[in-house]
């Protein structure tokens, strides 16, 4: 899980979602998981 100021999809499988007001990227590749912090 990467915590960064701007989250962007890295590959075509990445999905940008909102969870409890936080923007997150979820993906099949665990290295692509991101959270806005």
From Swiss-Prot:
GO terms for molecular function: structural constituent of ribosome. Keywords: Ribonucleoprotein, Ribosomal protein. GO terms for biological process: translation. It comes from the Bacteria. It holds the Pfam family Ribosomal_L36. One of its GO terms (cellular component) is cytoplasm. The keyword Ribonucleoprotein applies. Belongs to the bacterial ribosomal protein bL36 family. This is Large ribosomal subunit protein bL36. It comes from Bacillus cereus (strain ATCC 14579 / DSM 31 / CCUG 7414 / JCM 2152 / NBRC 15305 / NCIMB 9373 / NCTC 2599 / NRRL B-3711). The gene is rpmJ.
